[in-house]
Amino acid sequence: MSYSPYIGRFAPSPSGSLHFGSLIAALGSFLRARSQGGQWLVRIEDIDPPREVPGAADDILRTLDAFGLHWDGKLMYQSQRTEAYQAKIDVLLASGEAYFCQCTRKQIQAIGGVYDGRCRQLGHQSGAIRIVNRARVNHFHDGLMGEVAVPDSFAAEDFIIKRSDGLYAYQLAVVMDDAKTGITEVVRGADLIEASCRQLSLFNQFGYQAPAWMHLPLACAEAGFKLSKQNHATPVDKANPLPALKAALAFLGQPIPDAHSVESLLAQAVADFSVASIPRRREILIDGGG
């Protein structure tokens, strides 16, 4: 699938400083966009206040800048988009395409872990809000991993678009934001690969142009455990970006330029960038947590 012009993005959540795992996603999406002569946007996904760390968003942006990963256009903050999310939900509720659900996580686990739509016709006026999933997607093509499929039961589920605590769900926000900014390809970590099917469902149901997808291997300190802010992955060093940039290039299977500045390294990395060289694996074990 080809698009013109190319628009990519990096969308971190401000739950801590940028670490090596998130640098891989940032660098991979940046190189892909720049190698296509396209734009690279940055969006701060700050719609989950309990998980957010004060000052983390600004720290992430300063780190991107220190690493030469300069974004195009205006920054988007999801916290400034809540009126748009609510307006969409109001339309969905009014049209019968969404409904309130009062099922607990424990109740859903008791029936096998997949929600069965039992609240769809009950007329609740409070609780979580679920989409009536009319555009189910159980497979898609990934630009690195190839054909990806999910279980039919997962694809068919009426998933949550607004939580019972009043917070907007990731699936709704990311689809509306990608559509708003005209994203043509999403390049991100493989931990979100299954979520793409749900996002594709929303793109289709809302009549939005869906992007292409490319999911990069995750950096893991041990099998099944990606580097993350939650497990205290070491932040990358803003004062000395070259070693981490070179390590991230190596992780992505790219040649390491003989460069002594961030600018020259990235310029050569863009020129050399090859998707075919990226390992087609969901995770790669690395030494340590940095």
Swiss-Prot record:
Ranges spanned by the short sequence motif 'HIGH' region, renumbered to the chain: 12-22
Binding site for L-glutamate: 9-13, 45, 170, 188
Cofactor binding note of this UniProt entry: Binds 1 zinc ion per subunit.
GO molecular function per UniProt: ATP binding; glutamate-tRNA ligase activity; zinc ion binding
Cofactor: Zn(2+)
NCBIfam families per the UniProt record, alphabetical: PRK05710.1-3, queuosine_YadB
PANTHER family from the UniProt entry: GLUTAMATE--TRNA LIGASE, GLUTAMYL-Q TRNA(ASP) SYNTHETASE
InterPro entries reported for this sequence: Glu-Q_tRNA(Asp)_Synthase, Glu/Gln-tRNA-synth, Glu/Gln-tRNA-synth_Ib_cat-dom, GluQ/Sye, Rossmann-like_a/b/a_fold
Top EC class for this record: ligase
A cellular component annotation (GO) from this entry: cytosol
Enzyme Commission code(s) on record: 6.1.1.-
Function: Catalyzes the tRNA-independent activation of glutamate in presence of ATP and the subsequent transfer of glutamate onto a tRNA(Asp). Glutamate is transferred on the 2-amino-5-(4,5-dihydroxy-2-cyclopenten-1-yl) moiety of the queuosine in the wobble position of the QUC anticodon.
Span of the annotated motif 'KMSKS' region: 226-230
Organism field: Shewanella amazonensis (strain ATCC BAA-1098 / SB2B)
Chain residues that bind ATP: 229
Sites where the protein binds Zn(2+): 101, 103, 115, 119
Keywords: Aminoacyl-tRNA synthetase, ATP-binding, Ligase, Metal-binding, Nucleotide-binding, Zinc
Pfam families named among the record's database cross-references: tRNA-synt_1c
Name of the molecule in the record: Glutamyl-Q tRNA(Asp) synthetase
Keyword NAD: no
GO biological process, one term: glutamyl-tRNA aminoacylation
Protein's UniProt keywords contain Membrane: no
